[in-house]
């Protein structure tokens, strides 16, 4: 279930029946803080959760304009399931109603497929975009 950011009762109710929660964040400080609070709430509910970091731009991390992936993992306190790069193909595909996952040239789609395979128990190495 794709839930909004924040910790409303809706998020709490929707995660009640989940076997596993995927906390997806972007590498900006406000989103990471929300992800940390969400992870804390899930821990209080004894829910298993994993972290996916979306829209990663390595150049921003290298310039110090975005938090490092390791810092995000430490802050959120969750096992990393995937790293999805910022991808210029995503917005046009979404606007055209085409699922990104079917775009073989998309770096984001390749990483999303790896996340899905990991969820199914397949070993896929984590690749920094």
Question: Which positions does each model-derived feature cover?
Answer:
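Cytosolic-facing regulatory segments adjacent to core modules
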Residues: 1-3
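Short glycine-enriched loops at secondary-structure junctions
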Residues: 5-7, 86-87
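Hydrophobic/aromatic ligand-binding patch that stacks against planar heteroaromatic rings
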Residues: 13-14, 41, 72
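Active-site-proximal loop->helix
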Residues: 35-44
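C-terminal lobe/tail of nucleotide-utilizing enzymes
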Residues: 44-129
């Amino acid at each position: 279930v794709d839930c909004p950011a924040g910790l409303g009762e809706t998020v709490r109710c929707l995660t009640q029946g989940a076997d596993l929660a995927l906390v997806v964040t972007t590498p900006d400080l406000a989103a990471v803080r929300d992800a940390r609070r969400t992870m804390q709430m899930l821990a209080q509910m004894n829910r298993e959760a994993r972290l996916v970091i979306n829209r990663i731009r390595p150049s921003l991390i290298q310039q110090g304009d975005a938090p490092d992936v390791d810092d995000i993992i430490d802050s959120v306190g969750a096992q990393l399931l995937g790293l999805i790069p910022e991808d210029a193909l995503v917005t046009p595909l979404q606007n055209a109603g085409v699922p990104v996952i079917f775009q073989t040239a998309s770096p984001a789609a390749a990483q999303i497929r790896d996340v899905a395979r990991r969820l199914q128990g397949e070993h896929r190495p984590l690749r920094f975009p």
